[in-house]
Amino acid sequence: EKPEEAFETFKKENSEWVGEYALYMAVKNHFNSVSWNQWDEDIRNREEKAMEHYRELCREEIDFYAWLQYEFYTQWGALKDYANQNGIQIIGDIPIYVAFDSADTWAAPEMFQFDEKNEPKAVAGCPPDGFSATGQLWGNPLYDWEYHKKTGYQWWIRRIEYCFKLYDIVRIDHFRGFDEY
C-alpha cells in the first residue's frame, strides 16, 4: 500500500477520533494554544456554522495533525512488532481522567460533569493518604457516569480496546480513581 493510501486507510479506520482530535489541535493552534473554553463562543460550543468555517480555514493543518497521528501510529506499530518478535511485551498506561483542555472534553462535553457554560462542576483529586498528608487536587473533569451508563460505556470500551492495539498489557492509572469514585 502506498503511503498516501495507508494514510487514508488510517483516517478511515480511526475516523471516530482522529478527525475531532486534528480539528481540535488546529483550532487550538489558531487561538494561540489557549484552552478551548476561551475560544470564540461559536466554535467553543461547536455550532455547525463555526465547525464548517474552521474545517475549511484549517483544512491543511487538520490534515497535518491527522498525519502526525498516522506517523506515530506507524512508527509505534513497527517498534511494538520488533519488541514482540524479540520476546518483549509493551506495558502502557491509560489515565483514568482526561485533561479539561482536551479534544475529548471539547468534542463530547456531555460525557463530563459540566455546567451550562461547559465548565467542570467538580474536578478530580484524592483525599489525604500515605503519599500526601493534604491530599491531591488533580483538576481533571469528572465523568457523567449516568451518560456513560446510558451509552453502554461505549466510549470506555473503545478507549480501552484502542489501548490494546498499542500495548500488550494495559495499566489503569490510577485504579484508585475507579475504586474510590
Give residue ranges: language-model regions:
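Alpha-amylase-like alpha-glycosidases and glucanotransferases acting on alpha-linked glucans and related
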Residues: E1-Y73, V98-Y181
